[in-house]
Curated annotation (Swiss-Prot):
Pfam families: HSP70 (PF00012). InterPro entries: ATPase_NBD, Heat_shock_70_CS, HSP70_C_sf, HSP70_peptide-bd_sf, Hsp_70_fam. Residues 615-637 are annotated as: Disordered. The keyword ATP-binding applies. Belongs to the heat shock protein 70 family. This is Heat shock 70 kDa protein homolog. Transmembrane segments: none annotated.
Amino acid sequence: MPNAIGIDLGTTYSCVGVFQHGKVEIIANDQGNRTTPSYVAFTDSERLIGDGAKNQVAMNPTNTVFDAKRLIGRRFDDPSVQSDMKHWPFEVTQVGGKLKICVEYKGEKKMFSAEEISSMVLTKMKEVAESYLGRTVSDAVITVPAYFNDSQRQATKDAGAIAGLNVLRIINEPTAAAIAYGLDKKVGGERNVLIFDLGGGTFDVSILTIEDGIFEVKSTAGDTHLGGEDFDNRMVDHFVKEFQKKYNKDIRSNKRALRRLRTACERAKRTLSSSAQTNLEIDSLCDGTDFYTVITRARFEELNADLFRGTLDPVEKALRDAKMDKSQIHDIVLVGGSTRIPKVQKLLQDFFNGKELNKSINPDEAVAYGAAVQAAILSGEKCEAVQDLLLLDVAPLSLGLETAGGVMTALIKRNTTIPTKQTQTFTTYSDNQPGVLIQVFEGERALTKDNNLLGKFELSGIPPAPRGTPQIEVTFDIDANGILNVSAVDKGTGKQNKITITNDKGRLSKEEIERMVADADKYKAEDEKQRDRVSAKNSLESYVYTMKQQVEGELKEKIPESDRQVIISKCEDTISWLDVHQSAEKHEYESKREELEKVCAPIITKVYQAGGMPGGMHEASGAGGGSGKGPTIEEVD
């Protein structure tokens, strides 16, 4: 069975791992980084994903998309989307009630759903794994915040399908991190472990009991909209005000300036985890004005005081739900890059009366590590280190339906172990009622209007009868991905209807997913074509400059002057052509190279046969991938 991979699809960074040779390997990307920015950029000539996209963001802010995880499975009118839009340089809009991200790609306006952007990041992670493993990969386990609701999980699964992945399972990030911790620690007797997972955009707290390879989640709580990005936002707002006060200039409307400031703030935040203060130095931030300033750790903590303190609320809630006292927690495990912030650690440690926090696992890689283990288990890995592991996860929110008077009647209570199936019998509210409308909600409030509507369906054809007579049996069934199926059957007639919750019209239809898969293949082919084009251009450039240097340098005395001038003149023509044709097609570069070789090769061969060739020249003429021998030297602009 080919290895399945585990992908941590993060708000700001993603990470991929694979279980092989009895252990998990976290895979580095082509830049040598073990985490990859969850960024996708669109330019006049190409699409960039990962480091390449993040590195050019200041030059191309409106067409560089990030934070797709803060959009996925949400509606346009969601308050969190509306507040985030103030901070994003790219445009978010709605088309036919569906949320879309607008960019300009190759000179044309394009619209993408959050699932499509996430699928591009997943494709990148898939390619990272494939180039490491040396073969195609199709099976994957993808992680989501434990507090993600049904629509967000379903949308993440769809993103996997668009990326050409067979999603074996969607698992919760803190649970994945607990696997990494449990395997690493070889936990023996029963231990209560609290996972505190504060990442770039989401926050989860889960309490698990780990004993002899059984990971049982007791409770989970969190905020799907709190993380490092929010701390950056506070700093950005602070400096925008400072800049306005100092120079009387508002940089809010200048997207490039705002992006450069955000990048500097992100860097400053990281520095403040190890230093008491740091400088921000941004040359020519706005209208030629330089911005040099200082921020102390104390000021950073003050700007985020409410957010930092707020991380303790889900900790208290998780303890209450697990019916545990804080003294019963054996280990507090930190996961996610934002747990490096000293103030966050101090608040948590103080809450647990000075108990030591566990920092033994890598906060950036633990989730992908656990996902890779779960992927190995699901694809039948027989290694004894993992085969006896059992994961018992829970539903993060209560699920139920609306009954008379808009009351929420929960069939599955939050923190119920999944997979689970619950059935309850309902009846009609009025005499001779011909049908019932089954409206499915998730949430903890008593009235459905305060909860989230997941979907609805009609069970019709109920024979006329007095109210309270018909018996309608409703079944809620949550699968191991945390995704819900609801069915209803009229016991009298045997009529039934069912629904896989498809998130009030926000969910992609089967046809849309198929179209997006086709689009993804098309973009991938375009990316490859662009890579081939650049490679052909580099090969021609490398050949022409090598040739020119050789005949003007070490071969100068060995070639007849007339031949030398022929080569120089042809090289200069080619260089002039290259200056004008920066975006020619692959075949044009190749035919130019052939033309050049036709002129140069016979002259060089004559010198070579006469024994005048310096060592290695013959090889060098093929630098840039032309000769097929030795490594390709790629020039970097």
